[in-house]
């Protein structure tokens, strides 16, 4: 009897999890963190406990700076890797770090990953 109750609870948790992951809406790309200054596109990403926003839409064919902002960041998000450009650095615990990207083609994306591989962000170019 006790085994049946446990099996039922486990089955409900699995079904509920599957329902949650298949019905949630896809993430919408942010544009609020993108500005154009002196002919360059600035994409601001905050690193503290996670990267925010995790998905950004930016303009293609334009020089871009990814501006990483930290404020008391002492977790794995301070160890940033951007594989597509060979960038790997430890960000300051507080401050800003600019990462220059060459103009990207339409449809390209650039992803940043934390030192443990737990958190990431992506900039998609349209």
Where in the sequence are the language-model features?
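Extracellular/periplasmic metallocenter environments
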Residues: 25-37, 91-126
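Exposed beta-strand and adjacent loop surfaces of beta-rich binding modules
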Residues: 42, 63, 75-79, 109, ...
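Histidine- and aromatic-enriched segments that form or immediately flank copper-ligand environments
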Residues: 74-92, 122
């Amino acid at each position: 009897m006790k085994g049946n109750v446990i099996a039922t609870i486990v089955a409900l948790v699995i079904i509920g999890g599957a329902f949650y992951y298949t019905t949630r809406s896809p993430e919408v790309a942010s544009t609020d963190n993108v500005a154009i200054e002196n002919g360059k596109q600035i994409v601001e990403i905050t690193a503290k406990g996670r990267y925010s926003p995790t998905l950004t839409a930016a303009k293609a064919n334009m020089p871009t700076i990814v501006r990483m902002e930290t404020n008391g960041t002492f977790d794995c998000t301070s160890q940033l890797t951007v594989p597509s450009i060979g960038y790997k650095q430890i960000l300051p615990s507080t401050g800003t770090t600019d990462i220059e990207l060459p103009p990207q083609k339409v449809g390209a994306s650039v992803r940043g990953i934390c030192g443990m591989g737990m958190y990431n962000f992506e900039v998609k170019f349209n």
